[in-house]
Swiss-Prot record:
This is Cobyrinate a,c-diamide synthase. Keywords: ATP-binding, Cobalamin biosynthesis, Glutamine amidotransferase, Ligase, Magnesium, Nucleotide-binding. Catalyzes the ATP-dependent amidation of the two carboxylate groups at positions a and c of cobyrinate, using either L-glutamine or ammonia as the nitrogen source. GO terms for molecular function: ATP binding; cobyrinic acid a,c-diamide synthase activity. Its cofactor is Mg(2+). Belongs to the CobB/CbiA family. The gene is cbiA. The lineage of its organism: Bacteria, Bacillati, Bacillota, Clostridia, Thermoanaerobacterales. Residues 244-437 form the GATase cobBQ-type domain.
Length: 452
């Protein structure tokens, strides 16, 4: 049996992330906890890793598909003492107006019980009606119990617990009191990243104290499921010589899916982290580059001042080194970044365009793309799925676009996936786990470059 449960909320802001981090952190003191996150979010998963010391796995139905999602879940859950899935938005909120891809959908897909987080502030008997609605909206969702958040006092909790247990045959695992010090700071893309959150350890210690005193975590450990027979597919490529791939990893660039990095390694890559902020040179013997997303706009001044790294990457691209960059990586490879105050910071300059930060969200949500020309990952005619989320736009000439992008079911289309020599940069985030043929092409190009 697998000890596993999902922490889902009645709505965004109910407190599921705070409770997920607290419960993961407390259980990690005694157990090997494997965290998961429904949806494509990078920032929440970084917090998961911080409190559990284990990479978090994204369970995104749109990008992975059902079989890949189930395989990833059971593969990782089978290696842990307990697995905890943090949901996304409200329990039944999925793609567009449906529940497809929602926390509820994923819970049913991988057959796990749900613990519902309820914002109980200023509520009494109404809390039962609210919970009842979530239980009966879809009876196939296995809601085993609730945790009450923003509770006014112990007396308030006692009243709420009595009402719920009187009206509903459901477990009340505990509560969190109202405390503004538990709130994590936010910015334009969601939570402030782990790297930038002040007094995080102090906040977490206070949270852990509440969890240990107010929530029955041992009862949560009794939530189990019988996993299906699982046989892990062997994708590892046995090569005497690994392909050396340097990937940008620091405060400015850290948006990577665990499965993307693992896929690269399984297909023959030797991954070497480097810092565009602090390192002067690329790692010795680098044969290819992977520059993920992040917040280069926040660190634009420091990035622009590291001129030796800017030159190093520009020269490598011009020599034909294969490079794949997503979102923040695209911004870094542009001529420059202009912030909201109009300040301009020079970047690598592989592409002729600049990236301008905007107050208005430019793109948000799932996208599909048709490949219109061969590049280092994809062949013309192939289709890919991903997501975009950025407050920035391109200004200037956009050369050699190899993607035609659209939102599923929408008519609007736009170009992306810009190609220069063996460099591909796009605003679209993808999960490389689903594109192993593309990874093989990329690594083959890198290997060929290394032999020159």
């Amino acid at each position: 049996m697998c000890r596993v449960f999902m922490i889902a909320g009645t709505h965004s802001g109910a407190g599921k992330t705070t409770l997920s981090l607290g419960i993961m952190g407390v259980l990690s003191k005694k157990y090997n906890v494997r965290p998961f996150k429904v949806g494509p979010d990078y920032i929440d998963t970084a917090y998961h890793r911080y409190v559990t010391r284990n990479f978090s796995v994204n369970l995104d139905l749109f990008m992975l598909g059902e079989e890949n999602l189930k395989n990833l879940f059971y593969k990782n859950a089978s290696r842990a003492d307990v697995s905890i899935i943090e949901g996304v938005m409200g329990l039944y909120d999925g793609i567009d107006t449906t529940s497809r891809g929602s926390s509820a959908h994923i819970a049913k897909l991988v057959n796990v019980p749900v613990v519902l987080v309820v914002d109980a502030s200023s509520m009494a008997a109404s809390v039962s009606a609210l919970i009842m609605g979530y239980i009966y909206y879809d009876k196939d969702v296995d809601i085993r119990g609730v945790i009450l958040n923003k509770v006014g006092s112990e007396r308030h909790y006692t009243l709420l617990k009595e009402v719920i247990e009187r009206d509903l045959n459901i477990e009340v695992f505990g509560y969190l009191p109202k405390d503004v010090e538990l709130e994590l700071p936010e910015r334009h893309l969601g939570l402030l990243p782990v790297y930038e959150t002040e007094n995080l350890d102090k906040k977490l210690e206070k949270l852990y104290g509440y969890i240990e005193n107010c929530i029955d975590v041992e009862k949560l450990m009794n939530l189990t499921v019988k996993p299906p027979d699982f046989i892990e597919k062997e994708d590892r490529v046995l090569k005497e010589k690994k392909v050396k791939i340097a990937y940008a990893y620091d405060e400015a660039f850290n948006f990577y899916y665990k499965e993307s990095l693992e896929t690269l390694e399984e297909m023959g890559a030797h991954l070497i982290p480097f810092s565009p902020l602090d390192d002067e040179r690329l790692p010795e013997g680098t044969e290819g580059l992977y520059i993920g997303g992040g917040f280069p706009e926040v660190f634009a001044k420091r990035l622009s001042e590291n001129e030796s790294m800017l030159r190093e990457i520009k020269e490598a691209v011009e020599k034909g080194m294969p490079v794949y960059a997503e979102c923040g990586g695209l911004m870094y490879l542009s001529k420059g970044i202009r912030d909201l105050e109009g300040n301009r910071y020079s970047m690598v300059g592989v592409y002729d365009f600049e990236v301008v930060m905007t107050k208005k969200l430019q793109r948000f949500g799932y996208v599909e793309a048709e490949i219109t020309m061969d590049n280092v990952l994809f062949k013309k005619g192939e289709r890919i799925k991903g997501h975009e989320f950025h407050y920035s736009r391109i200004e200037g000439f956009s050369q050699n676009a190899s993607y035609i992008v659209n939102r599923p079911g929408k008519e609007e289309k736009w170009e992306c996936g810009f190609v220069h020599k063996n460099c591909l940069a796009s605003f679209v985030h993808i999960n490389l786990y689903t594109y192993k043929e593309g990874v093989k092409r990329f690594l083959d190009r890198c290997s060929s470059f290394g032999r020159k």
